[in-house]
């Protein structure tokens, strides 16, 4: 359903050249809103429908259920980070001459945003909890990557840093809100 109906519709709004979002001047270079936002909302609804894991919410309180293998989680994030270079850089859709320079800049901005997302999430958890949280830092990397995907073809390195940093900070509070207020696991 999502792949056959929802993504083509949301993609058409921006990427068909005459979609209503494109006509409003909306820029989504590599799919931050068109791909990641649609997938994120679908995942949130899916998690709400499936319900929490056993033991997650006991007596109305949110209990931490630790990950099973943080090393494999970190490896997965680093593989995803590497793949994002092809995703964002490949959205340039051409290689050679000036296009190669533009694609290189896209890859650099993407890398800067991912690193800034990690720094943002780690800094917030360090300030809040008195120690860094590797799991949340890895979420910050992904948040930085998602945050830069829309504007990676148009942003400077400083803009990429700021987008990633803000994404990394927001993800910490978003996860807490979804977990503790909305009670979606």
Show where each model-derived region lies:
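Hydrophobic alpha-helical transmembrane bundles of multi-pass membrane proteins
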Residues: 1-185
